[in-house]
Amino acid sequence: MAKRKQATATRTRRRDRKNVEVGVAHIRSTFNNTIVTITDPHGNAISWSSAGSLGFKGSRKSTPFAAQMAAEAAARVAMEHGMRSLEVSVKGPGAGREAAIRSLQATGLEVNMIKDVTPIPHNGCRPPKRRRV
C-alpha cells in the first residue's frame, strides 16, 4: 500500500513595503507596446506595467492612451511604496512616449529629469526589409 504524501503549503513571497522616495521610470515604447518599469536608483524594480498587461490587445496596445494607462498603473504602485520624485528615461520610437511621461506627472510624481536613451547604431546590423503594403 502506497503511503499518502502530506500536502505542503506553497510559500508565497509577501510583498514588503519598500520606502523609496526617489526613483527612475524606464519607459520602453515600441511600435507594438509600451512597457513602464519604475525602479529605485540602483535599478531594483519597484513596480511595472504594460499596455498588454492591462488588457489592451493587438493594435490598441500601441496607442498613446494605452501607454498613459500603463504609466498610471505603475505610478500608483510606486506611490504606495513611498515614491515622490522620478527621473524618466525613455527608450524606443513608439507612439506612447510623451503620453506616458505626461501621465506620470499627472499622478502627482515630481519629474526631475527626462532623458532619451534610445540606442542608435553606428551603422551596425542591417535593418529589416521595407514593408510593401
Curated annotation (Swiss-Prot):
Q: How does it assemble?
A: Part of the 30S ribosomal subunit. Interacts with proteins S7 and S18. Binds to IF-3.
The gene from which this protein is expressed is rpsK
Which HAMAP family does this chain map to? Ribosomal_uS11 (MF_01310)
Q: Which residues form the signal peptide?
A: none
- Say yes or no: keyword Transmembrane present: no
Q: Which UniProt keywords apply?
A: Ribonucleoprotein, Ribosomal protein, RNA-binding, rRNA-binding
Q: Which PANTHER family match?
A: 40S RIBOSOMAL PROTEIN S14/30S RIBOSOMAL PROTEIN S11
One GO term (biological process):
translation
User: Sorted alphabetically, which Pfam families does this protein's record hold?
Assistant: Ribosomal_S11
Among InterPro entries, the record links this protein to: Ribosomal_uS11 (IPR001971), Ribosomal_uS11_bac-type (IPR019981), Ribosomal_uS11_CS (IPR018102), Ribosomal_uS11_sf (IPR036967)
Q: Which GO terms describe its cellular component?
A: ribonucleoprotein complex; ribosome
Gene Ontology molecular-function annotations = rRNA binding; structural constituent of ribosome
Q: What does this protein do?
A: Located on the platform of the 30S subunit, it bridges several disparate RNA helices of the 16S rRNA. Forms part of the Shine-Dalgarno cleft in the 70S ribosome.
* Source organism, top-level taxon: Bacteria
Please state what the protein is called. Small ribosomal subunit protein uS11
The root-end lineage is: Bacteria, Bacillati, Bacillota, Bacilli, Bacillales
Protein source organism: Brevibacillus brevis (strain 47 / JCM 6285 / NBRC 100599)
Say which family it is in: Belongs to the universal ribosomal protein uS11 family.
